Amino acid sequence: LILLADTGAEQPHTYHFIETMDAWLRDRRLPEITVVKNVDRYGNRLDIETECLRSHTLPSIAYGHKQCSHKHKIGPQDKFCNNYPPCREVWARGERVYKFVGYDAGEQRRRDNALKYDLADKKYIKQYPLIAWGWNRDDCIREVEKAGLPQPGKSSCFFCPSMKKHEIETMRTQYPDLFLRAIAIEENALPYLTKVK
């Protein structure tokens, strides 16, 4: 099972790469990516852009928190797994499901910060194969190229406050409609901002 959580605001290259990756997986008789989304109890889509506009806020990372990833990435994946029969069967036996996390060898600090939560997790055994193999970002890029795949590009919302200046400039020139939507989110939140980190 390969899961990807769609926040409803991914950058265009991410959506394109899903199609490319699915074709690559099909050619190798591997399962395609299962895309999950944040929904309410009635099945209505809850995307992060609409949430920011309705609440007159920016993504939580602008305020020093990372709740957007928890709510729109981790939450939908956990909800899917909670209802996925193979996972339920493993848990019914009192065992844990293996979950593979794609942190590269340069991100060991992130893995280390998650360790106490990973050890306490009753449902999942987290594995970090890229770290175990010693693959840094350059190694990962090389392996992606060796597999005949294009580079996927950075996965983030098109209005993520963590974007670098060159990423914003690229979006402004390549996707002016998304750039204007990102500006609209900021302008919508501006009257309510008192402090931003």
Regions found by a protein language model. Name each.
Residues 1-197:
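Nucleotide-activated chemistry modules centered on ATP-dependent adenylation/adenylyltransferase
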